[in-house]
């Protein structure tokens, strides 16, 4: 005797926030800050995480699509016209003025989001879905350890702005070139170590003088680098519940492939 398996329920499409760019700023040579808002802001489901992120939808202008996009129909009938999603940390969510700010790292003409940000101007449209996120600094943590590359600096900055002035710990960040190293005010009890590459980031974490007590750890960046850092944290016996750890990107992978690999062994960070 056989029975039919229950049909898999499709998740409803997330609401699309159709926003208008209101300001752009070249914060550093490789960082462009975009602020966007408007009536569509209310479609964003906000949260209190300091690492909150949104999915930004980029449609190929050659396809003549206008938002909101019927992603389900495009996926089924015209997959070649399907817009691309890119994940970005929200630098600031201004509920009162109904606008959000996102920092885009730009490296020439690479990718989709960076070139868009480089040419974006007030009046342009930005379509976003979200927000996600789960980390927020715990004021009761014995100390904090924040490990990041350039992609996670916006989340680190937001976390610092929410920390008590008496917070202690360490920030270790891989951001090449001094002109690109940007953080808000850091509590007096926290140290900041800047490095220029992933190997130096791993070494700095490995060589860190470990304080007493279990730290709350935020570690995000390139996938293989984060895997190496995870092994160090295991050696330090940091429990999983004290960790916010994941890859934001993978070297040699476009985001579409990177996101797909999250469900495969290569994409797992245990």
List each language-model region with its residue ranges.
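Extended, composition-driven regions rather than compact fold-specific motifs
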Residues: 1-270
């Amino acid at each position: 005797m056989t029975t039919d398996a229950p049909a898999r329920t499709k998740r409803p499409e997330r609401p699309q926030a159709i926003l208008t760019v209101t300001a752009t700023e070249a914060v550093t040579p490789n960082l462009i800050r975009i602020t966007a808002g408007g009536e569509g802001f209310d479609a964003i489901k906000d949260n209190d995480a300091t690492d909150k992120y949104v999915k930004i939808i980029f449609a190929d202008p050659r396809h003549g699509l206008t938002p909101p996009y019927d992603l389900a129909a495009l996926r089924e009938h015209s997959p070649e016209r399907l817009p691309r999603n890119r994940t970005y940390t929200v630098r600031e969510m201004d509920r009162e003025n109904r606008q959000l700010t996102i920092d885009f790292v730009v490296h020439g003409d690479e990718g989709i989001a960076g070139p868009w940000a480089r040419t974006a101007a007030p009046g342009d449209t930005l379509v976003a879905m979200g927000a996600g996120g789960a980390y927020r600094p715990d004021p009761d943590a014995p100390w904090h350890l924040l490990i990041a590359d350039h992609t996670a600096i916006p989340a680190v900055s937001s976390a610092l702005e929410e920390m008590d002035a008496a917070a202690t710990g360490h920030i270790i960040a891989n951001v090449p070139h001094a002109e690109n190293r940007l953080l808000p005010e850091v509590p007096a009890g926290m140290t900041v170590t800047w490095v220029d590459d992933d190997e130096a980031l791993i070494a700095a974490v490995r060589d860190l003088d470990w304080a007493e007590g279990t730290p709350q750890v935020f570690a995000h960046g390139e996938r293989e680098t984060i895997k190496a850092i995870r092994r160090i944290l295991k050696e330090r016996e940091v429990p999983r519940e004290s960790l916010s750890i994941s890859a934001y990107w993978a070297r040699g992978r476009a985001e579409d492939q990177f996101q797909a690999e999250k469900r495969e062994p290569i994409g797992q960070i245990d």
